[in-house]
Amino acid sequence: MNTRLTVTVKIQAPSIVQKRLQLLFGAFICAIIFTIHASSANAKNDADAKKVYQMAYSATLDPKSGQAHASVTLKQHRQLVRSIEFVMPKERYLNIRPTARTEINGDRVIWKPLKKGDTLYFDFVIDHQRSNQKMDARITTTWALLKLDYLFPSATSRVVKGATSKTTLTLNAPTQWSIETPYGGGAGRLFEVDNTHRNFDAPRGWVIAGELGVRRENKDGRHITVAAPLGSGLQANDVLAFLRWTMPSLVELFPNTPQRLLIVSGSQDMWRGGLSGVASLYLHSDRPLISGNRTSPLLHELFHVASGLHSKVGADWIIEGLAEYYSLTLLLRSDGISKVRYNQSFDRLAQWSADTPCIATDRSKGKQTARGALIMRALDAEIRSETGGKASLDTLVHKLEQANEDLTNSSFRAAVMEITGAPMRALASCP
């Protein structure tokens, strides 16, 4: 006889008390995990904060002496900055007041700040002539124009790995003067300095101060300021009108174009050209927005500002050739000139520079720059052909921009090869 045994197991549902205990235990575990993560994040933030030091650059513009009375102050809670070496030529940097830990050797000043910080004082001669006897920095009784790169000289620093600076710039001037810098302007005298790709920040770019005519415009997310001494002859409204139609093409080519752009000019006896700086440029008031050969001096300098490209010895023709090529190409892209006139402009550049070879030079100008622009146009056509239209000179420029290194002739060729996989005929006659 078969006997079937049936076993019934009764599982009792957890009581309300048990459920509450489970919830409390889960919440307790989550709180512990959150506390561990928060403590870890706070520890990291504390460690990062301990690696931040304060740099305060200050200068008073003094029309009577023709100088800027300047200082550099470092504040740190521990020895993050071990030494800073400045290049300070004696003809422009006067009365350097060294501390006990400062060494002066010719034009080199090695500053070894104290553990908690220190201040270095000096005077700076503002007026400066270029080789053609024209001024590229000047101070008068009513205005001053100069580059911050020279007021606060280039420096090499020995800093604890991972340490970064929080940097400010203070500029003082006669009370009736206004001040414009790449970091802001107007009635302000204190500016925050933040230069990308640099852990050791220092003020850079053009500064103008005085009794000024100033125009401002916002275009494509960029705040543009045009400033010049009253009566200088700069047509600021024309400059802004020109940028209203060309700025979109520039920003499309260089999305990292600085959020602030400062364009300055001076008196008629200053250098009759253009000079770029960090987020800023100088342009003589007599320079046309579009020249007779249809290149644009303003777009040429804006290429330098927006791209941030620089070259080492012997490769200046590359940077200047690119700037001249794009001064025409950006006009074409923004419908500033027709394709027919665009082609005619390159024909004129070819005729003008026919007897000029492509040579390594420290400073490309005139016919050498025209030859460089022609080479860039030919290179653009070859890159497009070699890649089936998948790449162009724009691709190359973006690659160079991302590398963030000073160009050499060999590094330029290497970048081209990475895109095309083969040497380009356009560069056959180049260094």
PLM segments and residue spans:
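Bacterial N-terminal signal peptides
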Residues: 26-36
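Solvent-exposed beta-hairpin/edge-strand motifs
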Residues: 78-106, 170-182
